[in-house]
């Protein structure tokens, strides 16, 4: 039974790794700030999954320690990039949040140094042989691991907090995209915490089940980031789209960022406007010499 579980787990985690890479590429191809940040985040998520496969297959103590470090290092960088993404995604302008990005990068470097040292001198984790159904060793926490744990879950709390706070500040129709991302990160953190504090107690706690959730999280986060708003706007504009089918149509969201445009609008303004997903109403009006009040009133221009 243990062998069957191990085989199934390995197959599942390999599929999850492929999904992470595919979604990372798709996000990066969006060719904007959010896309690049998500692409890097998902790329590190794939590295986490790959290193965990190596952990499962490794039989030697030193090899297990090396691959465990290779697992913990990208985990921290993934959360650092996720926090940077969350600041951009929630359009947070608070200075403290942006300083937090720099602090997170410094902590990521310190975390990397700790786990580069750990295989030769155990300062963060040591390992106990168990000959389990899936892995051969489980970890025991040493003092320096506290830094890793506290700062990682600090980043988790920051990401969830930014998303929930943003959800309280936007119209009701837009709240699910922020709540969805925040809840997804929170669930993964809880599952990972089970693994951290109860390794080996039960079969599912012997392995980090949260790794399997990363691929689901990448899909959910990608969809909420790039597709949710357009889906909501399309539903709300289904009737007016038919009424104005012969007109160039451009729609901006409540923050003044472009959400929808049709091909006729692109043709009308292709010489004066460079359309991108980050185009704002103010930038559009400056490029076209259209009065911004016309857009705010909802009247055709």
Report residues per predicted region:
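Juxtamembrane membrane-water interface segments that cap and precede transmembrane helices
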Residues: 1, 128-144
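Individual alpha-helical transmembrane segments in multi-pass integral membrane proteins
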Residues: 2-18, 32-118, 145-153, 204-215
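Interfacial "cap-and-anchor" motif at the non-cytosolic start of specific transmembrane alpha-helices
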Residues: 6, 167, 171-240
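Alpha-helical transmembrane segments of multi-pass integral membrane proteins
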Residues: 25-51, 69, 100-106, 141-197
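Membrane-helix interface motif
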Residues: 116-130
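Sensory modules in modular signal-transduction proteins
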Residues: 228-260, 265
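PAS/PAS-like sensory domain cap-loop motif
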Residues: 265-276
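Terminal output helix/cap of sensory domains in signal transduction proteins
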Residues: 276-301
């Amino acid at each position: 039974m243990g062998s069957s579980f191990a085989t199934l787990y390995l197959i599942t985690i390999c599929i999850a790794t492929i999904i992470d890479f595919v979604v990372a590429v798709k996000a990066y191809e969006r060719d904007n700030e959010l896309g690049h940040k998500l692409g890097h985040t998902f790329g590190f998520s794939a590295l986490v999954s790959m290193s965990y496969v190596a952990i499962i297959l490794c039989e030697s103590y030193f090899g297990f320690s090396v691959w465990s470090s290779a697992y913990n290092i990208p985990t921290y960088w993934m959360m650092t990039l996720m926090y940077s993404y969350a600041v951009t995604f929630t359009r947070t302008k608070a200075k403290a949040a942006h300083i937090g990005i720099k602090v997170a990068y410094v902590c990521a470097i310190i975390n990397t140094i700790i786990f580069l040292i750990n295989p030769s001198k155990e300062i963060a984790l040591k390992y106990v042989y168990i000959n389990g159904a899936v892995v051969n060793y489980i970890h025991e926490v040493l003092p320096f691991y506290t830094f890793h744990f506290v700062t990682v879950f600090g980043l988790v709390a920051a990401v969830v907090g930014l998303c929930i706070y943003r959800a309280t500040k936007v119209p009701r129709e837009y709240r699910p995209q922020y709540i969805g991302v925040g809840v997804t990160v929170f669930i993964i953190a809880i599952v990972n915490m089970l693994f951290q504090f109860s390794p080996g107690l039960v079969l599912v706690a012997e392995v980090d089940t949260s790794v399997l959730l990363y691929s689901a999280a990448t899909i959910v986060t990608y969809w909420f980031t790039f597709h949710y708003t357009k889906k909501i706007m399309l539903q709300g504009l289904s009737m007016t789209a038919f009424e104005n089918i012969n007109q160039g149509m451009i729609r901006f969201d409540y923050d003044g960022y472009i959400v929808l445009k049709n091909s006729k609008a692109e043709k009308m303004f292709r010489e004066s406007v460079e359309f991108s997903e980050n185009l704002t109403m103010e930038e559009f009006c400056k490029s076209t010499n259209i009065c911004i009040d016309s857009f705010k009133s909802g009247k055709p221009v």
